[in-house]
Amino acid sequence: MMWIIIFGLMLICGIGGIIFLLTRFRRFGFVRKLAGNNNRLAWLLAGIPILLIGTSAFMSVFAFIVILIHLAVFWLICDLAAHIVKRITKKDARRYYAGAAALAITAVYLSIGWFLAHHVYRTEYSISTSKFIGMEKMRVVMLADLHLGITLDGDGFARQMKRIEDEKPDVVIIPGDFVDDSSRKDDMIKACKALNINTTFGVYFIYGNHDKGYYNNRDFTYEELEEELCKNGVTILKDECVLVSRLFYIIGRQDKSEEERASMEELMTGIDKSKYIIVADHQPNSYDEEAESGADLVLSG
């Protein structure tokens, strides 16, 4: 029911955004000049840029929605700014600068976003503990919310995993949303193979709210994803706890969206709390419960 409501709101916003942008493109001088007194032609000319933006939907519906929303929001802000300037100066602009500014800002903003999304940066955090972990330093790598296919495809992810392997990680933890409804089977298989890297303690995976898929439109099943992960040496944790080499624990929680999910009290039953405890929980909504249970480190998406 919730997803029907969300989809309905997105549909309403999408239709509203298209209508708003049509009225804005119609304000450009070249549209008025070409259309003359032909009102129908003016609307048709204003619709051409919308159709051009719509071609992005053939590559990704997600991309189309992102472009549409950003353009509509930036245009609304630019129109508001132009209105304020007009009130202050008491002069009408001879050209539709607000529209040109909205297009330029959207193009620059989304280009920067695309660049940052496709260029992965290494972020490092240093955490200290008084607990014995069997080594002077342990290198933990976390990969979350890849949403395979949105920014990185299978080959792109494989290149990033090679970078990670070169760092000589001790353990790799993937706290969910490795794939989603837009991911393709060939990319999924390549990405799972790329996870088969040399580590000290292995690669561990928990499910997020997107991994199992909300719809039936992708070309692989949740079971096929699980099969490929296991085939490549990945340990999947579903409300489970493992003692790694008798040194530290990794607890993998079911996602909060699941109907049945064990409490931290249940997951901590029988655990030696003198050992270091890592919890992987996709959604960062239960930190208080996890902190009270005695977890030392919680990794979320």
PLM region spans:
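Histidine (H) residue identity feature
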Residues: 70, 83, 118-119, 147, ...
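Generic structural signal for short, solvent-exposed loop/turn connectors between secondary structure elements
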Residues: 53-64, 91-93, 131-135, 244-247, ...
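Phenylalanine-focused residue identity feature
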Residues: 7, 20, 25-30, 58, ...
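Non-catalytic terminal accessory segments
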Residues: 1-118
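Arginine residue identity/basic-tract feature
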Residues: 24-27, 32, 40, 75, ...
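N-terminal signal-anchor transmembrane helix
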Residues: 86-144, 149-167, 184
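Soluble catalytic domains of enzymes that build or remodel membrane lipids, polysaccharides, and related
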Residues: 135-301
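Extended recognition/assembly regions associated with phosphoester-bond processing machinery
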Residues: 18, 63-79, 125-129, 267-280, ...
